[in-house]
Amino acid sequence: MTDKRAVILLSGGLDSATVVAMAKAEGYSCYTMSFDYGQRHRAELNAAARVARDLGVVEHKVIGLNLDGIGGSALTDSNIDVPEAPSEGIPVTYVPARNTVFLSLALGWAEVLEARDIFIGVNAVDYSGYPDCRPEFVEAFERMANLATKAGVEGQGFRIQAPLQNMSKAQIVQAGMARGVDYSLTVSCYQADDDGRACGKCDSCRLRADGFKAAGVEDPTRYFSKVF
């Protein structure tokens, strides 16, 4: 293998689109992976496909999972309302073990591709408080990846890269703009409609809108309602 390959988790949202652009700017051949996991905001899958095309990735995979069969999250269980105000502690929009599952499948693909880098757009500054977005989780998963794989045991270790980890949402927006990300293609809303329009009320919408405002960048998000 002569090219520098990376597998990148691409949800279709602002953060993951920025990560794809950052990896590409670093010279990686980008292979993106999205998941149809029973999320109520399935419009993000269409957004992920748009972003992958626009940024010219080598290959984009969509993996089907039934995390809605497990439930326990407002994002996968229609009986749990998506909150419209920030809450204390870990919110009900946390999907149990989601990033662990996603990274595990990305790890498998990376091993097949002989890619040594896996990128994820987690952030621990302007975020919702999910435990699987913290630096401790990313570091622990990397250690596990190099214990649990043939490549890792043979000394061809993996790196889990989280370049947005310590960036504010405004800094993320600015980084993406500098690398040509078209944020109008992305969907971040937890309850976006089928056309990709955002609710303007959930925590993800609030963080996104605040990020554009703080960055001094016009918000390209389409809303079906907005309370900010």
Swiss-Prot record:
Which keywords does this Swiss-Prot/TrEMBL entry list? Answer: ATP-binding, Ligase, Metal-binding, Nucleotide-binding, Queuosine biosynthesis, Zinc
Named in its record, the pathway it takes part in is:
Purine metabolism; 7-cyano-7-deazaguanine biosynthesis
Among its keywords, does the record have Ligase? yes
**Record-linked Pfam families:** QueC (PF06508)
Q: What Enzyme Commission number(s) does the record list for this chain?
A: 6.3.4.20
Give yes or no: UniProt keyword Ligase: yes
Superkingdom of the source species: Bacteria
Broadest EC class assigned to this enzyme: ligase
GO process annotations (BP): queuosine biosynthetic process
Annotated binding of Zn(2+), by residue:
C189, C199, C202, C205
Which cofactors, if any, are listed as required?
A: Zn(2+)
Q: Name one GO molecular function term.
A: zinc ion binding
Sequence positions that bind ATP: L10, S11, G12, G13, L14, D15, S16, A17, T18, V19, V20
Q: Which reaction does it catalyse?
A: 7-carboxy-7-deazaguanine + NH4(+) + ATP = 7-cyano-7-deazaguanine + ADP + phosphate + H2O + H(+)
Cofactor binding notes: Binds 1 zinc ion per subunit.
Family according to the record: Belongs to the QueC family.
Q: Which HAMAP family match?
A: QueC
Q: Relate the protein's function as given in its record.
A: Catalyzes the ATP-dependent conversion of 7-carboxy-7-deazaguanine (CDG) to 7-cyano-7-deazaguanine (preQ(0)).
Q: What is this protein called?
A: 7-cyano-7-deazaguanine synthase
Q: What is the lineage of its organism?
A: Bacteria, Pseudomonadati, Pseudomonadota, Gammaproteobacteria, Pseudomonadales
